[in-house]
Curated annotation (Swiss-Prot):
Any Gene Ontology CC annotation: cell outer membrane
Protein name: Alginate production protein AlgE
Annotated gene: algE
Role of this protein: Has non-porin-like, channel-forming properties and probably functions as an alginate permeability pore.
Compositional bias segments (type: Acidic residues): 93-103
InterPro entries in alphabetical order: Alginate_export_dom, Alginate_Permeability_Chnl
């Protein structure tokens, strides 16, 4: 039996078990709930490669069905969610799914391993959990999205009281549980994550805390430079890395905050050792470099709630950069981030570094201005401006949504140029009271009600993108969600 057949059979078996399991039997009530989320997404994208090669566009529509069942008996709860997607193109129906993130290797024109290419349509076992164990949504208690916001197999314990919040967990990806993906990404193979955090409300509305994350990767590096060219997702490093942060927070990511001023400040230190392949002139891996990592990043935000309908704010983020022979000051994120949060003060989770450019905090500096307007409870709008720079004008960026390649003798990124460009985002959401989720569940989903939403970003590349053929690129989504 093929792997796809096994997954399909498993989906059918899982659905059958849901129907006969006594935990989920009986009528819908306060302790037993089931339903389906129906999502229709229309996407228009042009051109993530900045006209340096063919492709880079997406135009189409997708239907995403997510039936789910949740039950609780005593102190034990369980949940299963399946997924079926049908689309006319490779459409992003889940902004937090790394398999649906656009991107490319700016260094070359080779595509990634075809076994990792998503199909237009697929079936998936999206989530399953019993108590604190399963394939579940891992999300930091501060909800900033730059540390943890992903679905992964894990043991995840949380505590949330009026004065103290705590979290601890272990995560490792074993499978994608999708009929269209045969293999894990190289970065996920043989990589284990241990994470935790603690927040204390030292004064009413003011929180102070820390987060820690450790990854251990004992996988294999590529054997030749050709392996890297043929698969842009080949493992880039192995080893052990540790992130440690301290932060101050005054409800910056709380859309229900009634405070006049909200702030956020976080400093993160990255340390550890990692191995990288070093290639000889013939392209073979002649040895592995042991690199000491010592890097930092900062993330700041300030929001003024002028009234209960209107606010304005600003944010700034910077990830350190710099490489040496046996040391690195290049910051990278944990790999479990979505970079999506409610930083504009509204319920909609928006990409912190641009809906179009979707940067990662590696060799990146971002300045942000935003304003939000909520004329009534069921309608909200955010207008956002971003300005992007490289920290080190000789180093590459992390993974992002802009992926030009070398063209006509011009490099994708020009040495000596820091200015990456600017972006304007417009997000509009209309909520509907119908389709509300049960009050005792819904943490796995971003939205608590049915809605229609416009997510749009217009990016204007600047001098650092030397080979660009386009002066702008856009990424626009219209999402319609209904729940039964």
């Amino acid at each position: 039996m093929s792997r796809k057949q096994r997954i399909s059979a498993g989906l059918g078996l899982g659905a059958s078990l849901l129907c006969c399991n006594p935990l989920f039997a009986g009528p819908v009530g306060p302790d037993r709930n089931f339903g389906m989320e129906v999502k229709v997404t229309a996407q228009s994208e042009d051109d993530r490669d900045l006209d340096t090669r063919s492709g880079g566009d997406a135009e189409g529509i997708a239907l995403d069905l997510r039936p789910w069942v949740y039950g609780q008996r005593g102190n034990w709860g369980a949940m299963v969610m399946l997924q079926a997607v049908a689309a006319t193109d490779i459409i992003e129906t889940d902004p937090t799914d790394p398999n649906e993130e656009p991107g490319g290797d700016p260094a070359n024109g080779f595509s990634r391993d075809s076994s990792r290419d998503p199909d237009k349509s697929y079936l998936a076992l999206r989530e399953f959990e019993l108590g604190t164990i399963g394939r579940q949504r891992i999300r930091s208690l501060t909800n900033e999205g730059t540390w943890w916001d992903i679905h992964m197999e894990s043991v995840n314990w949380t505590m949330d009281t009026s004065l103290l919040r705590a979290q601890a967990g272990v995560a490792k990806r074993f499978d994608e549980y999708r009929t269209d993906l045969d293999n894990l990404s190289a970065e996920d193979k043989d990589r284990t994550h241990v994470f935790g955090g603690l927040d204390y409300q030292w004064r009413q509305g003011h929180w102070a805390g820390f987060k820690v994350h450790h990854t251990s990767d004992d996988g294999d590096l590529p054997d030749s430079q050709m392996d890297v060219y043929e698969d842009r997702q080949s493992k880039s490093y192995t080893g052990d890395l540790t992130w440690l942060s301290v932060h101050l927070d005054r409800d910056f990511f709380n859309p229900r905050s009634t405070l006049p001023i909200n702030y956020w400040g976080e400093f993160t230190w990255l340390t550890g050792e990692m191995d990288r392949s070093h290639f000889a002139s013939d392209g073979s891996a002649d040895h592995y470099k042991d690199v000491d990592v010592d890097a930092w990043a900062v993330d700041l935000g300030l929001r003024w709630n002028i009234s209960d309908r209107w606010n304005v704010g600003a944010a700034y983020a910077r990830g350190q950069a710099g490489e040496g022979d046996d040391e690195s000051e290049q910051f990278m994120q944990t790999g479990l981030q979505s970079n999506r949060s409610t930083f504009t003060g509204l319920q909609t989770r928006i990409h912190r570094f641009g809906e179009a450019s979707r940067g990662e905090l590696t060799n990146l500096q971002v300045g942000t201005l935003f304003t939000s307007w909520k004329p009534r409870e069921d309608l909200e709008t955010s207008l956002i401006y971003h300005k992007f720079w490289r920290v080190d004008d000789d180093e590459d960026l992390g993974q992002n949504g802009i992926s030009p390649i070398e063209k006509d003798g011009k490099p994708a990124l020009k040495a000596g140029e820091k200015d990456l460009g600017q972006e304007v985002d417009l997000i509009i959401t209309r909520y509907f009271n119908q389709g509300m989720l049960p009050a005792n569940w819904g943490g796995e989903l971003d939205e608590q009600s049915a809605l229609i939403r416009l997510r749009s970003g217009l990016f204007f590349p600047s001098n650092a993108y030397a080979s660009k053929g386009d002066s702008k690129m856009h990424r626009v989504f219209v999402d319609m969600i209904w729940r039964f």
